[in-house]
UniProtKB/Swiss-Prot annotation:
Outcome after substituting I144 to A/G: Loss of PA-824 reductase activity
Similarity comment: family membership: Belongs to the F420H(2)-dependent quinone reductase family.
Gene (name only): ddn
Residues that coordinate or bind coenzyme F420-(gamma-Glu)n: 54-56, 60-65, 76-79, 87-91, 133
GO cellular component, one term: peptidoglycan-based cell wall
Membrane topology: Peripheral membrane protein
Top-rank taxon, per record: Bacteria
Organism: Mycobacterium tuberculosis (strain ATCC 25618 / H37Rv)
Protein's UniProt name: Deazaflavin-dependent nitroreductase
Catalytic activity as recorded in UniProt: oxidized coenzyme F420-(gamma-L-Glu)(n) + a quinol + H(+) = reduced coenzyme F420-(gamma-L-Glu)(n) + a quinone
Keywords: Cell membrane, Membrane, Oxidoreductase
Function: Involved in a F420-dependent anti-oxidant mechanism that protects M.tuberculosis against oxidative stress and bactericidal agents. Catalyzes the F420H(2)-dependent two-electron reduction of quinones to dihydroquinones, thereby preventing the formation of cytotoxic semiquinones obtained by the one-electron reduction pathway.
Record has Oxidoreductase as a keyword: yes
Consequence of changing S78A: Loss of PA-824 reductase activity
């Protein structure tokens, strides 16, 4: 049974906040080439994930915490533990071709859900990197997807 999430988590206010904070962080990231402000948040490295909007066909950019595993980039579709998956996750399910920017490096990758074995490997690493992921999982009935982006 999930813990009680923050009251605003599944409200339109939360979506508005996430949208605008993502835009601000993306702007800072690009302005600084992922160095310093914008390139990390709470001392955790940030990458920019670009998906194609499933309805608009337009590029959609989201700053996300990430892990590297060789040529792979691993991200969690947490949306802060909200009831629904983030829009970027729905976009990559419709079109798995993504671009990931890590500092000045831009990678053209293909995204997919982690296998059960990969999930068992990556989830503990994600939680070690950002312990709030464990809280996020406790706030929702959905299993937070782990996305593997690979060449």
């Amino acid at each position: 049974m999930p813990k009680s999430p923050p009251r605003f988590l599944n409200s339109p206010l939360s979506d508005f906040f996430i949208k605008w904070m993502s835009r601000i962080n993306t702007w800072m990231y690009r302005r600084n080439d992922g160095e310093g402000l914008g390139g990390t948040f709470q001392k955790i490295p940030v990458a920019l994930l670009t998906t194609t909007g499933r309805k608009t066909g337009q590029p959609r950019v989201n700053p996300l915490y990430f892990l590297r595993d060789g040529g792979r980039v691993i991200v969690a579709a947490s949306k802060g533990g909200a009831e629904k998956n983030p829009m970027w996750y729905l976009n990559l399910k419709a079109n798995p071709k993504v671009q990931v920017q890590i500092k000045k490096e831009v990678l053209d990758l293909t995204a997919r859900d982690a296998t059960d074995e990969e999930r068992a490997e990556y989830w503990p690493q994600l939680v070690t990197m950002y312990p709030s992921y464990q809280d996020y999982q406790s706030w929702t009935d959905r299993t937070i997807p782990i996305v593997v982006c690979e060449p």
